[in-house]
Amino acid sequence: MTAPEKPVKQEEMAALDVDGGGGGGGHGEYLQQQQQQQQQHGNGAAAAAAQDTQPSPLALLAATCSKIGPPSPGDDDEEAAVAAAAGVPAAAAGATGDLASAQLGGAPNRWEVLSATPTTIKDEAGNLVQIPGAATSSGQYVLPLQNLQNQQIFSVAPGSDSSNGTVSNVQYQVIPQIQSTDAQQVQIGFTGSSDNGGINQENSQIQIIPGSNQTLLASGTPPANIQNLIPQTGQVQVQGVAIGGSSFPGQTQVVANVPLGLPGNITFVPINSVDLDSLGLSGSSQTMTAGINADGHLINTGQAMDSSDNSERTGERVSPDVNETNADTDLFVPTSSSSQLPVTIDSTGILQQNTNSLTTTSGQVHSSDLQGNYIQSPVSEETQAQNIQVSTAQPVVQHLQLQDSQQPTSQAQIVQGITPQTIHGVQASGQNISQQALQNLQLQLNPGTFLIQAQTVTPSGQITWQTFQVQGVQNLQNLQIQNTAAQQITLTPVQTLTLGQVAAGGALTSTPVSLSTGQLPNLQTVTVNSIDSTGIQLHPGENADSPADIRIKEEEPDPEEWQLSGDSTLNTNDLTHLRVQVVDEEGDQQHQEGKRLRRVACTCPNCKEGGGRGTNLGKKKQHICHIPGCGKVYGKTSHLRAHLRWHSGERPFICNWMFCGKRFTRSDELQRHRRTHTGEKKFVCPECSKRFMRSDHLAKHIKTHQNKKVIHSSSTVLASVEAGRDDALITAGGTTLILANIQQGSVSGIGTVNTSATSNQDILTNTEIPLQLVTVSGNETME
């Protein structure tokens, strides 16, 4: 049996509110009392199960919110009016008995019971839009988070007339990615509106309020970009949102270093944009401190802390000390570590910096212990001079560069402690020097080597250099430089090499060449005072217009003929296939007028000892190799020279094919090697038309044809010698070449030939016939 429910009157609700002790607490007690009444009128099993279970989360939320503070007396009446306007009477709300469907919403000083009935409105196109939420009296919509998944929810701006179904032009789509494990709600409200019922895009705000009372503020969304709720020009402040037991911390602050431009062409660049490896700063951190002295010059230094515990490196400091009159300045410049970068600004306002240079305008350097020492530059306007003293115990090479102070420096860094107009003399002992046109420079050195290069700029804009070398000299006094302008002195290691230049006519000019150990301590110092043309090979450029252009072109020999030059030789295999071409010498001399080549006698020791004739075996000159144990004989000087290159290992012929570079002693070897790259096969077999790269391979192949060839002939007269008239007889004196061993019908070693297929001329042409030398006297007659 279920007992009828007992309605709760308005007076009882007011009494509960007053007796609760707090306005907010009255709501919580009223909800608890209503729940107890519902449990009492239920059946026994349902009541027992309800007592064992915990209260709903919505009831706990109402009990927690009731402890915030008491509402004002006027708020109670306002609550009733809002509840009545919402169409949800208190009695009806209590009579429903379903607390899970009830929703509470309110301002900081009031609470509202919102209806769970969805709101249906019409848009401009006439379509019905259903909002699954509850509307408050202030025009706000309360939407449960569990209904936001995979749904498009549109909120209407305040000021629009929702009664007649009109919707403003701006629609806001709620982000569907918001998820929650409990019944948390998202409240979307609008803080400003325009006169025409739309949203003021400049002042409107969308406020998303989770259950943890932490806010996410975002500016209004332009109509053209509905998907993006955060415009680029707005500011977003994220304090932290707790959803489902997870926390999202605040936005991390990102600090970006950008180049900052200052007056005077000065730019501060972030340290992460500088390649530390190229500056020699890898593995160490550097802190740079910049300051400006009394003369307006930037003074920069760094204290480098190396990551490795190296006891030899120490940090130096720059301690500018400016007195009251701003006349004297002491500068301490680090010189021990290359990672400490002195940075200054010259007269043109250009920031200067160098890593591998010992740079100072005035100071004292001790190379015996460079770690942790300082360069001190006392400046006085009364003396108007700078003192420089260089003391070293080891041979060092320094580069003294003197250049005009008005020109910007690009090779070295200048640490300026005073204005350039106050520098008029440089000395080592420290006495005052009167102002004069010439500058006297004195360097006190222990035995070592110094290279001094003075650079001056003429009024026409040309830069001239003067080179001075100091080797093992204790004192070099009164070095005069003809330049009256103020100079800046820089000591840097020498790392340059000056080569001689070839003039247009092919003459070599003498230019001092200095190879120093500025940054190569393992090499010795080499000084060349002058250069002559003896033993120097000139390699002019590729410009064809230059009169000194020299080109050497290697002419490839004719593949069908042997060209025996001064760098050619033949081996025994090549001599078997040697073909000598006989040409008319008189006709050759007519074509080669003015191109006579002088023959050079053989310079081998055997030919020199024999008076330039070599060993004469009969009428033929022989050249014998003078290497002990060899004794090879050659008939030409070029063959002997090629043979001697084989003994010495010289291989002047180089293959110019890509990625090859093989070297050969003879030119024919190089030519044969080139065929392996090109694939050329120029030797053709006359029988089967096969092609070969080398002639010896072809000769071996032809022998296979000769061994397999069998010639059958029935009756053939191969050759016949008939006696003719007397004028056909050969009468000569000397050696005559005749045919021998010719028999009728056959040739010795070949066999018979069928003359029906080939003629006698073809047989004699294509057949190897043995030759015999016969000597005939002048009075003999031979048939």
UniProtKB/Swiss-Prot annotation:
* Region: Repressor domain, residue numbers: 536-622
The protein's location, in the record's own words, is: Nucleus; Nucleus, PML body
Reproduce the UniProt comment on modification after translation.
Answer: Acetylated by histone acetyltransferase p300, deacetylated by HDACs. Acetylation/deacetylation states regulate transcriptional activity. Acetylation appears to activate transcription. Alternate sumoylation and acetylation at Lys-553 also control transcriptional activity.
Q: Which residues carry this modification: N6-acetyllysine?
A: K553
Tell me, what is an example of a GO biological process annotation in this record?
liver development
InterPro entries reported in the protein's UniProt record: Znf_C2H2_sf, Znf_C2H2_type
State its role: Transcriptional factor that can act as an activator or repressor depending on isoform and/or post-translational modifications. Binds to GT and GC boxes promoter elements. Competes with SP1 for the GC-box promoters. Weak activator of transcription but can activate a number of genes involved in different processes such as cell-cycle regulation, hormone-induction and house-keeping.
Q: Region Disordered: which residues?
A: 1-55, 302-340
Q: Name one GO molecular function term.
A: zinc ion binding
Query: Which residues, renumbered to this chain, carry the PTM Phosphoserine?
Result: S72, S565, S568, S648
About its domains, the entry says: The 9aaTAD motif is a transactivation domain present in a large number of yeast and animal transcription factors.
Coiled coil, from the record: none
Could you name the domain of life of the organism this protein comes from? Eukaryota
Q: Does the keyword rRNA processing apply?
A: no
Oligomeric and partner information: Interacts with HLTF; the interaction may be required for basal transcriptional activity of HLTF. Interacts with HDAC1; the interaction deacetylates SP3 and regulates its transcriptional activity. Interacts with HDAC2 (preferably the CK2-phosphorylated form); the interaction deacetylates SP3 and regulates its transcriptional activity. Ceramides can also regulate acetylation/deacetylation events through altering the interaction of HDAC with SP3. Interacts with MEIS2 isoform Meis2D and PBX1 isoform PBX1a.
The primary location reported for this protein is nucleus
| Cross-link position per record: Glycyl lysine isopeptide (Lys-Gly) (interchain with G-Cter in SUMO2) | K553, K595
Region Transactivation domain (Gln-rich): start-end pairs: 140-239, 352-501
Bias-annotated ranges (Polar residues): 322-340
Protein name, as recorded: Transcription factor Sp3
Q: Where is this motif: 9aaTAD?
A: 463-471
Glycyl lysine isopeptide (Lys-Gly) (interchain with G-Cter in SUMO1), cross-linked positions: K553
Bias class Basic and acidic residues marks the residues at 1-12, 310-319
**Zinc finger (C2H2-type) residue numbers:** 623-647, 653-677, 683-705
Note the Gene3D superfamilies from the entry: Classic Zinc Finger
